[in-house]
Amino acid sequence: MSHSPLFTSPPKSLCILRLSAVGDVCHALAVVQHIQRHWPQTKLTWIVGKTEMGLLSGIEGVELVPYDKKSGWKGVWNLWMFLKNNQFDALLNMQTAFRASIISLGIQAKYKIGFGKKRSREGQWLFVNRRVQDPETPHVLDGFMAFADYLGVPPAEMLSWQLAISDADREYAKQFIDPTRKNLIISPCSSKAEKDWLVERYAEVANIAHQHNVNVIFCSSPAKRELEMVKKITALCDFQPVDASGKTSLKQLAALIHQANLVISPDSGPAHIATTQGTPVIGLYAYHNPLRTAPYHNLDNVVSVYEENVQKEQGKPSSELPWVTKLKGKNLMAEIQVEQVVAQMRALNLF
């Protein structure tokens, strides 16, 4: 901590503003629970997206206030009315989206804290009166942890996550698991199709795992695009994989991932859920810097073609470029080879 802490004794109340997406909410959870461990008497209120609420509901000692972005101005107004009698010691605005800054206007807090210069976007600096010190390390979670540091919370020796997953959800997830074999989850879809790996390569990896007596499970959200993707992949498999696509809530997915030996996923929520469950994950990256966005604790397991493509597109390494540098090339995920992924599967002792 290279600055004077904002609080020299635990504050009475804090408001956390991080609406989405699932992966970022997993990062924020680590920070919130780190604060909670050091300041157990501090009242914590977290404004979170409606979808992400499905993962966080039930976590101990945190008041969760859901916000549905589809509700527009009416939803913002209702949120303000719900919180109007709250006077927080500080607001941690951990989302740079303009929508989050608008929401922050109606939240009463002595200190409104935002990101530092490198990581602040969409004019967030106009809506805050304090800014954290951006860390030297590029990972998103480290940037979130800077908020705890700014408050005066001691650094974490080891991050941990505690989701409230019920016995019923764990029991439901068991139907997809083979307890006599190792279990591999392939979650093939990200939020954007360009970040997905190739259908035939997912199938090839699944076939290789099956040949090594691994139980292969496919999962996805109920979105039509994702269900169709899984259908195309499984049609190319030499065997009948377990199809859990569209059949789990976020908590049931977390329970399923907890019981698996390994997850393979592009840049997506399930990859970060795996981190919360302590399950190894092989992240597949091309468009975003894995040092910034890969599953925490799993950066060494990544298969990435980002750095070589940064050099091609920008003519310099990612360390010399702006913190968020997304690549623009077409079909970059096609540069990830099956052999690279299989090598990581072996390194992680799947077979």
State where each predicted segment sits.
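Catalytic machinery of carbohydrate-active enzymes
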Residues: 1-351
